Amino acid sequence: MRRVVKAAALAAGATGLFSRVQTSVAIGRSFSTPQSQFQESSPVWKLGRLNHVAVAVPDLEKASSFYRDVLGAQVSEVVPLPEHGVSVVFVNLGNTKMELLHPLGSDSPITGFLQKNKAGGMHHVCIEVDNISAAVMDLKKKKIRSLSDEAKIGAHGKPVIFLHPKDCGGVLVELEQA
């Protein structure tokens, strides 16, 4: 009987100990997250959806075949865009798309990328914004560099600007007017 009482007393003491710890933790700690120092109360521009992920490829037909024949995606014909120095194949993924990029012409921005990355790879991500002019001005104030001084017309016929990868965690980010 003594053992049972002793075990019950230990259990009651342990329960009491744990309930005191739980109480002090609940009272002594705050789990709220402080507001970000970069958050503004009324932003002048807003991020939209992911428009596309662009992948530089050394063999456009082979890459197209993979997405079309192996994964079953809807894949466009090759679209030459000489003003941008690329040939593009658009891969429809339902909620977004991919752009398969291949160099076109001697001044292609993709040539240097493929020289460094022989097998190809992710080139950039494109995110829509509701006001590209306001976004550019705001990002300049925040010391985020862009690859051009102002937005230019992109492959989709809309204004775009590329942000410097060194200011974006190593990722080339394209902002596109929604």
Swiss-Prot record:
<keyword id="KW-0170">Cobalt</keyword>
<dbReference type="GO" id="GO:0046872">
    <property type="term" value="F:metal ion binding"/>
</dbReference>
<feature type="binding site">
    <location>
        <position position="124"/>
    </location>
    <ligand>
        <name>Co(2+)</name>
    </ligand>
</feature>
<feature type="modified residue" description="N6-succinyllysine">
    <location>
        <position position="116"/>
    </location>
</feature>
<keyword id="KW-0496">Mitochondrion</keyword>
<feature type="binding site">
    <location>
        <position position="174"/>
    </location>
    <ligand>
        <name>Co(2+)</name>
    </ligand>
</feature>
<dbReference type="GO" id="GO:0004493">
    <property type="term" value="F:methylmalonyl-CoA epimerase activity"/>
</dbReference>
<feature type="binding site">
    <location>
        <position position="52"/>
    </location>
    <ligand>
        <name>Co(2+)</name>
    </ligand>
</feature>
<dbReference type="InterPro" id="IPR037523">
    <property type="entry name" value="VOC"/>
</dbReference>
<keyword id="KW-0413">Isomerase</keyword>
<feature type="domain" description="VOC">
    <location>
        <begin position="49"/>
        <end position="178"/>
    </location>
</feature>
<feature type="modified residue" description="N6-succinyllysine; alternate">
    <location>
        <position position="152"/>
    </location>
</feature>
<dbReference type="GO" id="GO:0005739">
    <property type="term" value="C:mitochondrion"/>
</dbReference>
<feature type="transit peptide" description="Mitochondrion">
    <location>
        <begin position="1"/>
        <end position="38"/>
    </location>
</feature>
<dbReference type="GO" id="GO:0046491">
    <property type="term" value="P:L-methylmalonyl-CoA metabolic process"/>
</dbReference>
<keyword id="KW-0809">Transit peptide</keyword>
<protein>
    <recommendedName>
        <fullName>Methylmalonyl-CoA epimerase, mitochondrial</fullName>
        <ecNumber>5.1.99.1</ecNumber>
    </recommendedName>
</protein>
<dbReference type="InterPro" id="IPR017515">
    <property type="entry name" value="MeMalonyl-CoA_epimerase"/>
</dbReference>
<dbReference type="InterPro" id="IPR029068">
    <property type="entry name" value="Glyas_Bleomycin-R_OHBP_Dase"/>
</dbReference>
<keyword id="KW-0479">Metal-binding</keyword>
<comment type="similarity">
    <text>Belongs to the methylmalonyl-CoA epimerase family.</text>
</comment>
<keyword id="KW-0007">Acetylation</keyword>
<comment type="function">
    <text>Methylmalonyl-CoA epimerase involved in propionyl-CoA metabolism.</text>
</comment>
<dbReference type="Pfam" id="PF13669">
    <property type="entry name" value="Glyoxalase_4"/>
</dbReference>
<dbReference type="InterPro" id="IPR051785">
    <property type="entry name" value="MMCE/EMCE_epimerase"/>
</dbReference>
<feature type="modified residue" description="N6-acetyllysine; alternate">
    <location>
        <position position="152"/>
    </location>
</feature>
